[in-house]
Every structure is written in C-alpha cells, then in structure tokens.
C-alpha cells in the first residue's frame, strides 16, 4: 500500500500544533520555506492561531521573544531547514536567561539526507545545546508510529517548559513529497486512534506539580532594603507595596517600571558619604533579577559578604524562576514564587525601623534637582542623551516603553525616574541584535502605543526588522540615539590607541533613508523642546511608526557624566 507522505506530514503537524494550542500557544511566527510546508499550512488553517511572518529568521526569533515577553504565553516559531534554524539561536539564548517560553518548530530533512551532501541539510540535532530547556527530535511521520506516542512526547517537552520556562525545540523530519491536495480523512483510521483527544479541549496528558511555600521569617527588627529588578509592572508594584508597608528604602531598576525617593542609585552609590547611609542595612530583599547597575551589584557583593566574615546581613531573593541568579555567589535565600504571592503572605508584617533611610532620600532629591537643572532647564538648548533619559518618564506616560541595550539603558538607570510604566528590555544576554523585532513583538501582543529607545549601532544591526512596523497602525515612536558608533566604550578602560577603530567603529550614517525604505515617518529634532513636542503629538494624534533620530556628538554623554560626577562630589 502506497502512503501519501505529504498528507501524513500534515497529520503529524496538525496533531503537534493542536496540542501546543491546548498548552496555551496562541501566536505562531512563520518564516518562508518549503520543507516547513506541513507546519505552515496547518498553522495557517487553524483559526485559534494569530499568525505573524518575517522574511528574516533572526528577526523572527526576536519578534516571537517580544510576543512571549508581553503576552506571558508560549509562542511558536516555524522555520525551514538549514541555516534558517541556526539564525534562531540569538533569540533562544536570550530566552534561556530571561525565561520567555518559545516553542521552536524546525523542519528538517529525513535522516537519510543528513550528512551525505544533500542540499540545505545541516545537523540540527542539539543545535541549540544548553540554551533550550528541552528538545525533541521526531522521526519522519509513518503510519507505524502511533499518534499517542507523538502526543506524549510533545507533552513531555511542554511539561518541562511549564516548569522551567525558556525555549524548547521540536525538530520535525519531513520526507518529500511536501505538497498534496488529498484530504487528511484518507487516513481516518489512523486519526481515530486518538479520537477521544481530538474531541476534547484538553492536553493528551496532564501533570500537576505540588506547590510548597516555606514560611517567611519575621523581619520586623531589621533595617531592610528592598531592591526591585526586572519584573512585570504588577509584580513590581506589589514589591513596592511591601517596602512601603515596612517603611524601608527602595532601589528600583528601570526595568521594573516603578521608582522611589531613592532613585538614581547608580549615580549616588559612587559617592562615599551617600552610600555610607546604607551601612546599617542588615537585610536585603530583592524582587526580580537582571539589575542593570554594576555599582549596585558591587555594593551588594561587598555588603552581604560581611555575613561570611562575622556580620549578619541577610540576602533574600524572590523570583518564580528556578534558575540560580546569584552572580556574586552570596549566601542567599530564594523563594521561587511570584512577588505578589510572597508579599500577600507578609501582609501582617511591620518594622520597628520604618523610615531608617529617610535622610538619604532627602539628599537624593538634591541629585534629581541638580540633574534637571543641568540638562533640561532650557528646552531650547542642544539635545543630549542624558536629557532624553531624564525626560523619559514624561514621554512614556500612558504608553509602553522598550529600552535597548548599551549606553542608553544605563543613562535611564542613572537619570530616569519612571512612574508605573510597563517596561520591556532584552537584558538576559544583553545583545544589541533583534531589538526592533522584539519591540514589534511586544506591541503586537499588547496592542498599545510604544516608545522605544535604541542606539545607532543596534539600529544598524536590526535594520531589516523595521519592516515589521511598516503596516502597523498603532502609534509607535522609535527613538534612535545616534552618537556615531559605540560611545559606551568611552566608559570602559579599552586601549586608547584602538578605541575608535576596534570599539567605537564610527560609521557616519543617518537613518532618514532607512525609514523611508520601509515606509516609516521620520523626524530629526534639533532641540529638546522640538523632540518633546513631536513625540507627544504623535502619540496624541498620529498612527504608525515614527522614527526620531537624535544625533549627538560621540563623546557628549561621557563628558556630561564626568562633569556631573564632579558636581555630585562637590554637593556632598
């Protein structure tokens, strides 16, 4: 009996995708390719899926990352065989470190065509190595392989992802032919072997993990410090509520979307007199991870290390992820639960040392006022990246905020003060690639206006993903801070003789024609007032994407930082 392989390929694809949908996959991202036809056609025919496409697999991976980041759901990707698969690695590596759930469906040649010189065939087994939580290498579809085996195999991978997060990889070896008009009912008997599952709405297998919640020790006699890292806004707000309840100072990373009276800590922690006001802290409670400030991480290591030398400072960490997040290898108590759930269990807590760091908060107000006086007091003055960082809270009101990597995210960490803003970043591997694509994915999932900040080198790296904004009707402002290369290296002790040629790599490019190529609006303001006006006006009455290029001298931000540091030491 001859087998219609194309139909069998589609039956397996339909089975996999239906089960993924029951695991919560609603968005599917597809790149063009022939070998992936069975998956592509079945995804397109499934009314439960929202389909997203991109011609570049690297950008596709980051778009899926943004969708998963914003929706808090697993997102599937479908790509063809060969280097298309390899191009997904950067996004998968980021997801490994930040926990977004990607389900990577890669089409492959059958085993007999791998390693023998066949076209577009590479070894895809284990290609993502330790960057995925689990992987499944499927054989070529045959009638002798039961569909219930296929389902339990997919379920096992998805159960692992449910527990550990990050990406999982399902490699699908499809033999030719790949195209057929024959109906799948030709193999109705094969389909009926899982008829009960097909008629239901639940996953083939189900697994229930017991939840354990360790008691939270009383901390009312501690002088505590609350640190809020990268978290969804609702979780960050819960963490700040705990700090307010205890009367303790709060150091909020800009990725949290909240702030406090102890803002700008990456600036004032370098001032010995100000930093010393935290010396009495004997308990640090950190919610969420990925703190941007290197100065805070150094302070944390130094302060908590006293515990190993006869001191008594404790370090608590609250994050639902099971992975180790302890770069200084400190003695740490980790509650693997959502901050909101942890805070709810402390509703009766109070502290006898409430307000112990209020004097420091009063000093920090002077830092805020001084920064505003230096950099944004005259809206008609020349634009600077620090001015943009100070102004970000005003421009981001009522919209989502996506912040790229390198210099600008650090300036927001130093000078920004966000007020209940939903913030998105790629601060796992902290690469400069895929940022436009990730931002597009976030906006597609949330359907909100978006303000994005990205550096010029990052923009060049992901330029073709501007195509993802071409047909968007939602207003978005893509601010490109163009300092002509990697100005961040001015902050690092790189060899002076090689600084420009091998680190900064100035390019001399502007972005007006790039915006036009992808049908996007473009403006290049010359003053802070003009910048503020055009951003606010676009969110008020515009639609689609507006590229705003802010051009500054390459050494401006670093010179401003050096000057401000001197002023800070003079103030205190």
Swiss-Prot record:
**Which reaction equations make up its catalytic activity?**
isochorismate + 2-oxoglutarate + H(+) = 5-enolpyruvoyl-6-hydroxy-2-succinyl-cyclohex-3-ene-1-carboxylate + CO2
The reply to whether Kinase figures as a keyword in the UniProt entry is no
Q: Which SUPFAM superfamilies match?
A: Thiamin diphosphate-binding fold (THDP-binding) (SSF52518)
Q: Which cofactor does it need?
A: Mg(2+); Mn(2+); thiamine diphosphate
Pfam families, A to Z = TPP_enzyme_C (PF02775), TPP_enzyme_M_2 (PF16582), TPP_enzyme_N (PF02776)
Tell me which EC number(s) this protein carries.
Answer: 2.2.1.9
Question: Which keywords accompany this UniProt record?
Answer: Magnesium, Manganese, Menaquinone biosynthesis, Metal-binding, Thiamine pyrophosphate, Transferase
Query: Annotated pathway, please?
Result: Quinol/quinone metabolism; 1,4-dihydroxy-2-naphthoate biosynthesis; 1,4-dihydroxy-2-naphthoate from chorismate: step 2/7; Quinol/quinone metabolism; menaquinone biosynthesis
Q: How is the cofactor bound?
A: Binds 1 thiamine pyrophosphate per subunit.
Extract the Gene3D superfamilies matched here.
Answer: 3.40.50.970, TPP-binding domain
In its keyword annotation, does this UniProt entry include Ligase?
A: no
Looking up InterPro entries in the UniProt record yields:
MenaQ_synth_MenD, MenD_middle, THDP-binding, Thiamin_PyroP_enz_TPP-bd_dom, TPP_enzyme_TPP-bd
Cite a single GO MF annotation. Answer: 2-succinyl-5-enolpyruvyl-6-hydroxy-3-cyclohexene-1-carboxylic-acid synthase activity
Residue spans crossing the bilayer:
none
Q: Example GO biological process term? A: menaquinone biosynthetic process
Outline the subunit composition.
Homodimer.
Which family does the record assign? Belongs to the TPP enzyme family. MenD subfamily.
Function comment: Catalyzes the thiamine diphosphate-dependent decarboxylation of 2-oxoglutarate and the subsequent addition of the resulting succinic semialdehyde-thiamine pyrophosphate anion to isochorismate to yield 2-succinyl-5-enolpyruvyl-6-hydroxy-3-cyclohexene-1-carboxylate (SEPHCHC).
What protein name does the entry list? 2-succinyl-5-enolpyruvyl-6-hydroxy-3-cyclohexene-1-carboxylate synthase
Origin organism is Vibrio campbellii (strain ATCC BAA-1116)
Q: What's the source species' lineage?
A: Bacteria, Pseudomonadati, Pseudomonadota, Gammaproteobacteria, Vibrionales
